[in-house]
């Protein structure tokens, strides 16, 4: 039964083909939006990036185990 279904399905109407086209169109849209924003000179929009000032450190650092370069940055 599944074999017959696969034979009847054309490559153009398969689920995988449709999903690939949706992903491809989405990527093209994001790229074109980024180019348009760059041309207009506006700020870049970032997806799923949390602002740095909203992140609070939850770890306490023991400075004895840090390399010198890291201690200088702290």
Swiss-Prot record:
Taxonomy, superkingdom: Eukaryota
Propeptide residues according to the Swiss-Prot or TrEMBL record: 45-74
- Which keywords accompany this UniProt record? Antibiotic, Antimicrobial, Secreted, Signal
Major location (coarse): secreted
Tissue expr: Expressed in the body wall, intestine, uterus and ovary.
Q: Which InterPro entries does the entry link to?
A: Cecropin
Q: Its GO CC terms?
A: extracellular region
User: Subcellular location, in the record's words?
Assistant: Secreted
* One Gene Ontology biological process: antimicrobial peptide secretion
Keyword Signal recorded: yes
Q: Which Pfam families match?
A: Cecropin
Q: Give the signal peptide range.
A: 1-13
Induction behaviour: By bacterial infection.
Family note: Belongs to the cecropin family.
Its annotated function is as follows:
Has antibacterial activity against several Gram-positive and Gram-negative bacteria. Is weakly active against yeasts. Acts by a nonpore mechanism.
Q: What protein name applies here?
A: Cecropin-P2
- Specify the species: Ascaris suum (Pig roundworm)
């Amino acid at each position: 039964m599944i074999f017959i279904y696969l034979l009847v399905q054309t490559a153009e109407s398969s689920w995988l083909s449709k999903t690939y086209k949706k992903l491809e169109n989405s990527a093209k849209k994001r790229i074109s939006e980024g180019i348009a924003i760059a041309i207009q000179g506006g700020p870049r929009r970032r997806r799923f990036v949390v602002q740095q000032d909203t992140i609070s450190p939850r770890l306490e650092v023991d400075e004895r185990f840090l390399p010198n370069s890291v201690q200088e940055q702290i």
